[in-house]
Amino acid sequence: MEQLDLRLETQKPFLSVSHLGLAASHAGITRVFLRRGGMDRSPIREAGRVREILKEARREIKEYLAGKRTFFTVPVDLSQVPPFERSALEMAAQIPYGEVRSYKWIAERLGKPDAARAVGNAMARNPVPIIVPCHRVVRTDGNLGGYSFGLIRKENLLELERRHNAY
């Protein structure tokens, strides 16, 4: 697994943490994560397909955050994610840009209507947030629920999509 530092220069408050990290396998992106102080920031030398996947993901995430991209085409590698969680994430990936669905909605589509809490847990463990848009999944009562990058970022990602979806 290779990693690439993804620096985002922006005035948006939900990205006041100055950068994200990406990890990939030869099959696709395996992780999107917030880089925190104290982590090794030395450059990683990627090669071949992994390097291309990381470059593509960086470009697509920057376009998304600039409101210029509504879906991702970069391959994602969820092979290490348990089957139920993978199915829930694949369903979340189908939620249209600028829209939200509930944890229960996903559970029902998976044929497990009583598994809304398990869907919530799957979203909380999403290894590739933003690319697989778990921020578009909310509680049935309309409350946001949780988000691995924090609720303020979830709110801001949803607002970004609402704002750019209006055009």
Predicted segments with their positions:
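Thr-Gly-centered strand-to-loop micro-motif
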Residues: Y103, P133, Y147
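Regulatory, non-catalytic segments
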Residues: D114-N126
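Short Lys/Arg-enriched helix C-cap and helix-to-coil transition segments
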Residues: I130-V137
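…primarily DNA-binding HTH/wHTH and HhH modules…
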Residues: T140-Y167
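Basic nucleic-acid-binding alpha-helical/helix-turn surface characteristic of O6-alkylguanine DNA
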Residues: M1-P113, H164-Y167
